[in-house]
């Protein structure tokens, strides 16, 4: 399955839930959960419909969608109108194998960006991968 989460045009990043041409499509419908999460968890970047592209890239906003929607493969594609569509893909072939101690250790050794709560990120990783952190 594929979930369209955002579009990129020129210097603007637009969440799919806010894109007038796409928001009612089956592919973009799930993206509305990102805005709801943003309201519930006070994440302004998920609630603002349009953001400067540099901000979206700097904050790695598309990657926020992965744990929220529970889909872990992010891809870009060119839409019919020439914009870039950011899509989350899910299929059995894309599922991660069971975590190994070495993989868990390597993942937890990565320092998250300063604007991310490291303890919360570690806890989320442990929860999603079913490992003690």
Language-model regions, residue ranges each:
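Long, contiguous hydrophobic alpha-helical segments, chiefly transmembrane helices and signal peptides
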Residues: 1, 86-87, 122-126
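C-terminal structured interaction module
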Residues: 114-133
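N-terminal membrane-targeting/anchoring modules of bacterial envelope and secretion proteins
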Residues: 1-30
């Amino acid at each position: 399955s594929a979930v369209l989460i955002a579009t990129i045009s020129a210097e603007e990043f637009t969440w799919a839930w806010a894109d007038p041409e796409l928001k009612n499509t089956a592919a973009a419908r799930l993206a509305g959960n990102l805005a709801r999460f943003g309201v519930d968890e006070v994440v302004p970047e998920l609630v603002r419909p349009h953001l400067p592209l540099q901000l979206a890239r700097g904050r790695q906003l598309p990657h926020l969608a992965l744990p929220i929607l529970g889909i872990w493969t992010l891809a870009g594609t060119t839409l019919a109108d020439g914009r870039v569509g950011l899509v989350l893909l899910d299929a059995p072939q894309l599922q991660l194998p069971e975590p190994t101690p070495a993989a868990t250790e390597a993942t937890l050794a990565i320092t998250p960006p300063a604007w991310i709560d490291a303890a919360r990120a570690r806890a989320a990783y442990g929860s999603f991968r079913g490992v003690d952190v």
